């Protein structure tokens, strides 16, 4: 009985270790893939590091999904408002398929159609930090321009008035949504 228990524990620890190694191995590959990708589509970018990669779906027989925070000037336009942060989705649809960058808008709110819908959104140009709370919840700190709801005084194109902490949650059948917005600082 004791030998079976020890054998079970050892087998479990090996399988957990191999899952972790697979996830770390994929993240290491994603660093290389993303750095090649962002260099090919943008200028003035910082290199992606392991800390910029967030696991959404761990490697399994159904594939895996990661979100990657990075910054750059897509298209190399060189304007004062063209450099931004992005959250890209990198997925593998099965263990024997390659990792693919599937979008630069993983949360679905960094696009003109969403901005024109007059919904609360994150200003990706001014992201300060992104922290994963769980696979379905993130905390993002970013600045935003003054508006009727929060007020504040902007200081030009590069000086938005308000600093917020956003909680972004995945809601079943709705997708990613801002579920909490807390004002941290304000220019008056």
Feature roles, as predicted:
Residues 22-27, 121-188:
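Acidic, small-residue rich beta-repeat scaffolds with periodic aromatic anchors
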Residues 4-15:
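Sec-dependent N-terminal signal peptides
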Residues 48-123:
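Surface-exposed acidic loop/strand-edge motifs in secreted or periplasmic proteins
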Residues 19-65, 175-188:
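Terminal domain-start segments
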Residues 1-4, 181-183:
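Composition- and surface-driven signal marking solvent-exposed, interaction-prone regions
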């Amino acid at each position: 009985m004791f030998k079976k228990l020890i054998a079970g524990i050892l087998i479990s620890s090996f399988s957990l270790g191999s899952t972790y190694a697979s996830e770390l191995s994929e993240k290491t590959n994603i660093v290389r893939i993303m750095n090649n990708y962002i260099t090919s589509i943008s200028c003035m970018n910082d290199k992606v590091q392991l800390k910029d990669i967030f696991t959404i779906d761990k490697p399994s027989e159904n594939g895996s999904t990661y979100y990657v925070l990075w910054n750059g000037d897509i298209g190399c336009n060189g304007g004062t408002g063209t450099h931004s942060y992005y959250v890209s989705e990198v997925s593998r649809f099965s263990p024997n398929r390659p990792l693919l960058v599937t979008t630069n808008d993983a949360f679905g709110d960094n696009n003109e159609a969403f901005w024109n819908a007059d919904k609360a959104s994150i200003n990706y140009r001014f992201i300060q930090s992104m922290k994963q709370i769980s696979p379905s919840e993130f905390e993002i700190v970013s600045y935003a321009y003054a508006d009727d709801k929060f007020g504040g005084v902007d200081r030009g194109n590069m000086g938005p008035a308000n600093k917020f902490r956003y909680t972004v949650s995945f809601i079943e059948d709705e997708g990613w949504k801002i579920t909490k917005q807390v004002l941290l600082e304000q220019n008056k």
